Structures are given as C-alpha cells and as structure tokens.
Swiss-Prot record:
GO terms for MF: aromatase activity; heme binding; iron ion binding
Entry-linked InterPro entries: Cyt_P450, Cyt_P450_CS, Cyt_P450_E_grp-I, Cyt_P450_sf, Cytochrome_P450_Monoox
Protein name: Aromatase 2
Lineage, opening ranks: Eukaryota, Metazoa, Chordata, Craniata, Vertebrata
Gene name of the record: CYP19A2
Entry's Gene Ontology cellular component terms: endoplasmic reticulum; membrane
Organism expressing this protein natively: Sus scrofa (Pig)
Amino acid sequence: MVLEMLNPMYYKITSMVSEVVPFASIAVLLLTGFLLLLWNYENTSSIPSPGYFLGIGPLISHFRFLWMGIGSACNYYNEMYGEFMRVWIGGEETLIISKSSSVFHVMKHSHYTSRFGSKPGLECIGMYEKGIIFNNDPALWKAVRTYFMKALSGPGLVRMVTVCADSITKHLDKLEEVRNDLGYVDVLTLMRRIMLDTSNNLFLGIPLDEKAIVCKIQGYFDAWQALLLKPEFFFKFSWLYKKHKESVKDLKENMEILIEKKRCSIITAEKLEDCMDFATELILAEKRGELTKENVNQCILEMLIAAPDTLSVTVFFMLFLIAKHPQVEEAIVKEIQTVIGERDIRNDDMQKLKVVENFIYESMRYQPVVDLVMRKALEDDVIDGYPVKKGTNIILNIGRMHRLEFFPKPNEFTLENFAKNVPYRYFQPFGFGPRACAGKYIAMVMMKVTLVILLRRFQVQTPQDRCVEKMQKKNDLSLHPDETSGLLEMIFIPRNSDKSLDH
C-alpha cells in the first residue's frame, strides 16, 4: 500500500527532473559557447595585442587614441607590444605597424588604398567621399587624383621654382609683419603665408587675404584632427563640436567665395589658355558633369591647405635644426654658392643640390611632421605571416620605422644617415605605391627653393638655445609644435653676401 502511494510521487519527481535537465543543459551549453566565443575572439590571431576583456579592451584602446593623440598612441602601443600589433578603434580591429617589410607590403598593394575614419567626422569636415586626402570612394578618388597628379607634375612642377622664389622674396622683403617687439620672427606664420601664397598663385590664382585664410586653415585642421576618430554617439550632441563645425564652415565659405570669383574669371577670359590651372581644370570637369560642385570645392580647398598645414611646419623644424647645427648650415651655404652663386635659382638646379636634399631627408626622418599613414584592407591578405581580414584598419607608424632600421645613427641628427643611398623600403616620408603623396616632387622643390632663398639672405638663430628636442609638441594626426607654449620664434640675421657665400 505504501509502495503504491509512493509510486505516483516517483513518476512526478522523474518527470520534473527530465524537464529541468534540458533547460539546465541548454543554459550551461549557451554559457560555455559564449565563453568559448570570447576566448576564440581573443585568440583568432597570434598578433600581439592588449586583452579583449569582454569588450573593455577595445574601449580602452579607442580612448587612448582620443586622449593621447593618434601618433602618441601608436608609439605607446608599438613600444609596449612590438612593431606589428593590434588594437581596436571604434570597435574595429586596427593594426599598428612600424616594421619596414610590413609597411612596404601595405604601401605597395592596391587593396590598401582606402583610409579609415569616423564617417560623421569626415562628413563634418567635408572629406567624406570628396577631395583626395580621406576620400574612400575608389572611383571618385581615382577620378580626382588624375587632376592632382597633372597639376603637381609637368609644367606645374617647372613653374613652382619661379613662383615659390618670388613668393619667398616678397615675404622676406616685408619681414616686419611677422616680427615681434624684440625683433624675433614668427617663423610658423611666415612659412604658412609663403606656402599659401605659392599654392594660390599656382593652383587658384585669385587674390586672397593671407593673414585671415591662414588662421582659418588652422581652425579647419584643428577640427579635422579632433573629429577624425570620434565615435558616432559624440555627434549626437552638437554642442560638443560646435566650435569645430563653425571653423570648418568659416573656411569653406571663404573658399567658396574665392572659387566663385574663379568661375567668373573663366567666363570673362578672352582666351581660356590664359587661366588654365588646377582650379580651372576642375571647374571645366564640373561643367562636363564629371565632378560635383561640392567635390570641386573640396579638392581646391585641400590643394590650398596642404602646404600651409604640413610643409610650413616641416621647414619650421628644419630652420631650428640648422640653428643648432652650424656645420650643416655651412655645408648648405657652400653648396648654394657652388651651384647657384649670385644668380636666380632655376629648375635645373634642383637635382644638383645634393647637400640640401640630404638635409631635407634627414630633417624629415629625425623630426617628421607626417609620421603615420592610415589605411584599410579592402580584401583578405597575409602580411609577414599574419592574417589580415578585409575591413581591418591599419596605421603605418613610419616615424618610428625611420628610427628602427638601416640608419647608422638613428637617434641622432646627422647627414651621415644619408651619406649612402637609402633603399626606399626603409625611408618613406611621402609614401609610395598607388596612394603615395601626389605632391611629393613639388614639395621637395618648394622646400629646396625656400631654404636656398632664405639662407642666402639670413643666418638663423634661436633665442636662449631653444631646439626641436626640447620643444613641446602634439603628436596626433600629424606632429606639430604646441603653439600655446610660445618660445617658437627665431632670430633672422641679415648676411653680408660676400662673406656669407664664401663662408
């Protein structure tokens, strides 16, 4: 009787257990699968990297880029994890590479011609699928690059010598505009005005207010640098980037006015050949329906801001290095006298200025301005044995690479580092391959002409033994001196031409 009473209870218990076990098993299996997924995610690659930690790692790495700046964060991670390592930006895998063979591979292949950055950030500054610098639409990028390459080579390259020399001479003749009460020269402002004037004369040809436009270019660059890697939720709060949005609008509106004047000059020109230049070519392409008006405006804007943004700072660093190394200055001045003498500089002088060229290269190696390159993988690949998936972001830390391999004295500033030919895989200040800097040849001409004209007229010194090594800098999208710290002026001492050129 008792057994019969317990029998139904037995069946109820076994029924309950049979119902609970599947649910418990499913829960355990799901949890195990989730943990295995996380474990596998962290170990899908042998590439050195910080831990994933349930998604906390990617948040920390992205925050570090926003906090330290792109360049400083890259140096930090390469120092911590090696010359080929992985982090996350915006939740996307990002490789930071400073190994020459890997850098060479990425630059060489066409499936790395795309760049990466925040879509709303690029839209805000007008670079999303427009212009050339961060245009990631392959078809549009190729279309506009043709116009840039044409303007930056051939006749434009030949004309640059005279145009740049005239601009430098004009600005040196009115040096008092950039001198302070102590007689010190604001070299950054001087160089920015020279580079803007030269670019305008060669590529747009419309009179502009140099002082005002240079300030607006700096505001635009600050916005570009600040917004490039910001996460999407940042742009949901317009007050967070109101200042940058206004800076972008300010420059674009001023550029639109200048470009509209250019359109009018084309219409009223008696001969179209008389006003043919970069801007005219783009405007005619717009009329043919090949480019949109917005893209044309962005291309012209980018052409005009490129030199004031980078070359001006590059020459600024060069002059500080010359001031610290008088033996280098002596060698440069001696070569100027030997090659050019008292006559005007000519295009055929460019290839003969070997000391000047080596000085430029060593300056760009030792104290770079653009020390990183941002790319995105457009297809699966393998780099130096590491698998790279399509869509992976890549930052080439070329500034660090230039101090790691090949050079006999990598941590010193010395022309000995270029006494012998340097294989281009070890030195890439302008990049190479399908997305190399379109203006690398014309940039070399501008720097050579600037140094020759300036050093023929002035000896440069720094107050109180200031130097680039002690200078406060910001290493973000590019490496710039911290202009809020001051102490960036130089002393220009007029040369006695007879004595200086026989120096």
